[in-house]
Amino acid sequence: MSGTSMDGVDAAYLKTNGIDIIETGMAITLPYGESFRNELSEIVSKGVYSKNVESQITNIHADAVKHLIKKNGDARGSVDLIGFSGHTIFHIPNEKKTFQIGDGAMLADLTGIDVVSDFRSNDMINGGQGAPIAPVYHQVLANNLKKPVVILNIGGVANITYIGDDDQLISFDTGPGNALIDDFIFFRLGYRQDTGGKLALSGKPDKKILESLMDHIYFSLNIPKS
């Protein structure tokens, strides 16, 4: 997958029976080069499609799959399928509009493995907000934990998953995550991220700014929301 931080492609090797995770293998991040990151950032900021960028990002995902298989020590034939979310170019959930670049057929050709893709659109058609994978994965991780359970995932955008006693599943975005932090660090210091949270740990929260941010209308909206 490729997230809002636009730092690279994350790939993980999982064995599942569709209900439980039977085995976890290696996980890798294949970083984007500076030139491609700039190209991707440009089309995201404009909300436009680029066949060239789509082709490049699909090739990078294929490379990530090949690296992961090699690192995990498995033959390509042992992988049944690839889940491919692509990269979101624009997302307007209230209008049920979402678009991701990434060519699933091309990825299948490049890897020789079946590909499942474009699951965000189907989630929105069925009343979701276009982010179906994280909550289901969290639910599987929590199979053997005492319920209720809450899991907070801080990616570029932060999201929360609630799993109730009866396995009720509720998930929604809580607000900005690492994306704004990364932008701030880059524009002020020229670094891509606050590695290890060192700068954050050296300071303290500004309560006035935090209170003004918490007044944002998003926090008063009912779920589902993203």
Tell me what each language-model feature is.
Residues 4, 8-30, 170-226:
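Conserved ATP-utilizing enzyme core subdomain
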Residues 30, 34, 51, 55-62, ...:
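Electropositive phosphate-/nucleotide-binding environments in soluble metabolic enzymes
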Residues 93-98, 113-193:
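Phosphate-binding/catalytic loop of phosphoryl-transfer enzymes
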Residues 1, 78-83, 149-153, 171:
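Short glycine-aspartate micro-motif
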Residues 48-104:
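Short beta-strand-loop/turn "lid" adjacent to the catalytic site in phosphate-handling enzymes
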Residues 107:
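Polyanion-binding surfaces on beta-sheet-dominated domains and ring/shell assemblies
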Residues 13-72:
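Glycine-rich nucleotide/cofactor/substrate-binding loop typically near the N-terminus or early
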Residues 74, 110-114:
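A structural motif corresponding to the C-terminal end of an alpha-helix
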